[in-house]
Amino acid sequence: MESSAGDPYRRPARRTQWLLSALAHHYGLDRGVENEIVVLATGLDQYLQEVFHHLDCRGAGRLPRADFRALCAVLGLNADGETATEDANSAEAASTNPAAGMIAGGDADVREEARLALRADPPELTFRQFHARLCGYFSSRAGPRLPRGALSEHIETQIRLRRPRRRRRPGSPSLHGGAYGERVAHLEEENSSLRELVEDLRAALQSSDARCLALQVGLWKSQSDIPEAAAHELQRAQGALAEAEARARRLQRGQVEVRLRTEEARQAVRRSLHRVRELEALARRVPCLQRQVQRLEAELRGYRSEGPQLLTPQQASPRPGNRNGEPTAGGTRDSDTTPEGVQRSDSRDTDEEDEQLFRSVEGQAASEEEEEERWQEKPGRPQAHGEVPLVQPSGCVSRCDDQTAETLKASFGHCDGAEHICTLELETHVTRLGEQLQTLGTPEEEAELQQMVEAEHLRLELQMVETERVRLSLLEEKLVDVLQLLQRLRDLNISKRALGKMLLNALDRNPSQEGTCGTLAILDTLHQALVGCELLQRNPSAPASTAPAHTNPFLISC
């Protein structure tokens, strides 16, 4: 025999579980012998009818499924929980005793039947279904019923059969006279009174307990709705919080992207400004370069006009009066000295390119001087006191020609006019010098080509400068328009979210374009978006910003 702690139906019942105790007592699952339980168990059908009547507050004759489940929860008839507990107890008993394991197998079937009896599948239950489920739950668990005497069976039978209630009948005349008959009549009257009292007590207890159960079911439903509503509200709040966090993360990513693109646009504007400054510096150098090109072209034309004109040397004839005098070409030489000096003074003003050309000519002249010195050192050459008339070429405008002519005059100034060998050698040497001077035209042509190439490069750079200036002026105008529109929108109190959305849309429309063209396209798209803003269309006469234009750091002055 298990103890009362192991069997929940053998513990004394609380007042809130009189129905459970009455059902357990009726089906042999004793929860403690108490007078009120015995009284309630005598009219179990009426007890269940009172409970159903109080639960059916609408009077429709049907009990909702939620109310039946709440009643089971109040009574502690949780089939799943009890099944799990009793399964654990059965498993422990089966491990200790094989016979008890066989009994536990049968108990598992009984518990399954009890759990199925409490399962209220229909949405609403009639009294017959309500009675069948509660009684079926306990009848499936019913054990051996307690022995009852004939008097108890008679009382229960009388109570069940007495419908409606019948009060005491008027006393009949006693058949037996005497004191014994009076005593029997008195006892019967007391028994009838006791039966009526028991019936009244049972009805009152059943009605009050049914009312108490109905109130407990309502309280259970109200309390069960609160956690569900709170859980639903908490779940909804958590969903809103998650959505807000996701929106905040998207906004943060958008802000980071806007900052990055703004920084890229700022860097592009800085590069454009730096390029504009470079182009302005180049533009300031253009007039100087043009003057230099014009000067070089003038010098080149002078070289072309004077270079191929080489005068042939005059034939020297021996004159008596001229042996110790001045040479006949002295006047010509003196006349050529003045323009050569003027040209020499002009050539000193040229740049490093002219200096390189002069150094090459001086090197050639130095080599000629070395040849003249070797020619003078030949043995057996007669020395004369006369001078040989020389003709200085007028086409050479550099200092090397003067030095070469002076060297030749110093070498052959004292030669005798009668010696034709010296004259022929001098003419041959002068002719060779003329040919060498003609060969100097090749570096001059190269210099001319180089100057033409440089002039073409300068022209192309100038054209690029002009094109870049026009493009930057357009970019400046677009920037000024965008900044003015932004200032107007700021005066109209536009929201930062709407302004950021327009900027992101303008940036997203040109994702693949980079560089200056992409910046201009983005500015154009942003300008169109700002012009089409509803706030500006609703307020076309909104005042623009009164700030001066030179305070804007994005303005470009070309």
UniProtKB/Swiss-Prot annotation:
* Transmembrane residue ranges: none
The disulfide bonds in this chain are none
Alphabetically sorted, this entry's keywords are: Coiled coil
- The chain positions of domain EF-hand read 43-78
Keyword presence, Coiled coil: yes
List the residue ranges of the region (Disordered). 161-183, 304-395
Q: Which residues form a coiled coil?
A: 179-304, 453-495
Name one molecular function that GO assigns to this entry: calcium ion binding
Ranges of compositional bias, category Basic residues: 161-170
Asked if the Swiss-Prot or TrEMBL record annotates the protein with the keyword Disulfide bond, the reply is no
Q: Can you name this protein?
A: EF-hand and coiled-coil domain-containing protein 1
Gene from which the chain derives: Efcc1
